[in-house]
Amino acid sequence: MSKRKITKVNNLNFEPFDRYGKVIPGMTWHKISFDKETNYGTYISKLEPGTKTIPHIHMGYEEFFILEGELIDSDGTIFKKGDLVTFEPGTKHSSHTKKGCLILTFMRGENKRIKEK
């Protein structure tokens, strides 16, 4: 018996994004295979225009693919539709979006909150 799961990107049930213990205003997510205990898995996040993420450090790898819109990293790099981005363990950053975006994320470890610079 197959244990296949098909996720229809145009028909998702988004919930408030609460990975860091508090909800980030303007950010929601749809968990595909994400496990909050291990911080491993896949999810799709939606950021409304003007949304800012919480500064954090990557304890494991995180990769994401921009499905729609664009995301601006704390160093000014702009990630656009079609970009696949890899953050290695030890990376510290935060991001924001002016236009909004939809992101497919692959997590392999915890992100820990850090204080803003």
Report the location of each language-model feature.
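Short acidic-glycine-tyrosine-enriched beta hairpin
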Residues: 73-92
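Short glycine/proline-enriched turns and hinge-like loops at secondary-structure junctions
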Residues: 57-59, 77-78, 97-99
